[in-house]
Amino acid sequence: MSNVVQARDNSQVFGVARIYASFNDTFVHVTDLSGKETIARVTGGMKVKADRDESSPYAAMLAAQDVAAKCKEVGITAVHVKIRATGGTRTKTPGPGGQAALRALARSGLRIGRIEDVTPVPSDSTRKKGGRRGRRL
């Protein structure tokens, strides 16, 4: 199968951009619509040297720009965005890189279709880490 997607004239070729923004790193992962084939996957940690900067908005922006360039190479012109935080028993708010990655994808010329939050939310979860009296500083 060839990696270049053919588009009919005047139509968008969609992919799915999955942005996982934790407080330690940001992943920008683009797949085809079915989710089976990975087109590009770049993390904030691949773009910066210091460990503390992996989750920064700047690292997320660089990662998203790399992914967008690869998408255009392959022929994808638009993406549906699924943004995700750590979730579960941990935080349900995306890290600092989530917003920056989304903005960088839009500014790099990719059309944005739907934006969806797919953070896993427990219906009735296991016990949260930290014990009965919580984390004591």
From Swiss-Prot:
Where, per the database record, does this protein carry N-acetylserine? 2
Location within or outside the cell: Cytoplasm; Nucleus, Nucleolus
Q: How is it modified after translation?
A: N-terminally acetylated by acetyltransferase NatA.
Q: Which domain of life is it from?
A: Eukaryota
Output a single Gene Ontology CC term carried by this record. 90S preribosome
What does it do? Component of the ribosome, a large ribonucleoprotein complex responsible for the synthesis of proteins in the cell. The small ribosomal subunit (SSU) binds messenger RNAs (mRNAs) and translates the encoded message by selecting cognate aminoacyl-transfer RNA (tRNA) molecules. The large subunit (LSU) contains the ribosomal catalytic site termed the peptidyl transferase center (PTC), which catalyzes the formation of peptide bonds, thereby polymerizing the amino acids delivered by tRNAs into a polypeptide chain.
Quaternary context: Component of the small ribosomal subunit (SSU). Mature yeast ribosomes consist of a small (40S) and a large (60S) subunit. The 40S small subunit contains 1 molecule of ribosomal RNA (18S rRNA) and 33 different proteins (encoded by 57 genes). The large 60S subunit contains 3 rRNA molecules (25S, 5.8S and 5S rRNA) and 46 different proteins (encoded by 81 genes). uS11 interacts with eS1 forming part of the mRNA exit tunnel. uS11 interacts with snoRNA U3. uS11 interacts with MPP10. Component of the ribosomal small subunit (SSU) processome composed of at least 40 protein subunits and snoRNA U3.
* Family statement: Belongs to the universal ribosomal protein uS11 family.
- Protein's UniProt name: Small ribosomal subunit protein uS11A
What organism is this sequence from? Saccharomyces cerevisiae (strain ATCC 204508 / S288c)
Source gene? Answer: RPS14A
